[in-house]
Amino acid sequence: LIALDLSRLLSRVGRGTPTGIDRVELAYAEHLIASGSPAAFTAVAPGSRLALLPHPTAAQYVAAIGDTWRGTADPAGQDRLVRRLGRQARIAIFAGRERALLSQLRPAPTAPVPVYLLVSHHHLERRQIFARLKARCAARFICLIHDLIPIEFPEYAKPGQAANHLRRIETATQFADALIVNSAVTRDALQPHLDRAGRMPPVLVAPFGADLPPPPLGEGPPFDRPYFVYVSTIEARKNHLLLLNLWRRLAAELGERAPLLVLVGQRGWETENVIDLLDRCPALRDTVIERNSMPDAAMVALLQGARALLLPSFAEGFGFPLIEALQLGLPALCSDIAALRETGGTVAEFFDPLDGPGWRAAILDYAAAGSPRRAAQVSRLAGWKPPRWSEHFAAVDRFIAEVAAR
């Protein structure tokens, strides 16, 4: 039996465009439900205890929020459904007892050892939850680590987040029977913490998949000017400031001939200078378009008509938007950082995140009709094989079976 923790998904009701971690937890839940394997669903409840979710409630909630994010149902009706199912799930968690979960996680004499699986960082800093779980049942604890960015780059994190994330990593290195990571970059960042803990649990490197819906038929580009897209929460490490300053200059120099910049993502924290530019800079009003929420179907249509995806981030653990863009055949201009190099390989173009002139030259080149430079990347894309969720889960299923059999 696999008990998958859905705490993060339950916290995302009404939050708009899903983050990469949201997508991962959804993908795991959908895979587990579709597989028909023995499964349970759990979430953290008040008092730092884990409680069982009724299986039908969990399955209905997962289906509803998946349809919402993909844009495959009426938005207003779907939002009401997600909120109603979310309330039902939270009531069940609030009323549930940890004893019921623990009884599920006690192995039968001839069955494989059950697994408690946490694929977000949600409540991983609460060491006592996992200490109690390990003390009271024989279940294997497997968790997925997405990145160590708050520890490596505390200047880009909220105050206190570096210490909080360090507690998460310490919990994982102390209590996890096995670990899953999304990239070799994340594995290498995690290794010193494992060395310090003096434990060597098995670590699986399993890149995430990108299975976007097919592009809509017969729809042309949503804008009549060349445009570029940046898909990201607006926060300091994502380096929106580089693009906004560049676009302000392009607007002043080119006027209506300037390409458009479309920003897709929620506004984050400590980005006053970026928000001020978005809200108050006259030069950006006609050239920068902000979309806080966008379902997958609309995202595919937007990406399909773009000149390139832009990713000027200072730090990443994986880079979901990059594989999604490349999967659609859209060129990408990226920061020259290890995680994006690992994902983009020899296909994307890479620049120092502070190289304003380099970014500017590439953007103007890619914006031009018949750009040879853009065509060269499109040609390289022909030999690129996108990672698939099916491959990810084939590796993860084998890994979990091996850990449960130990």
Task: Label the model's feature ranges.
Residues 1-406:
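Carbohydrate transferase catalytic cores enriched for Leloir-type hexosyltransferases
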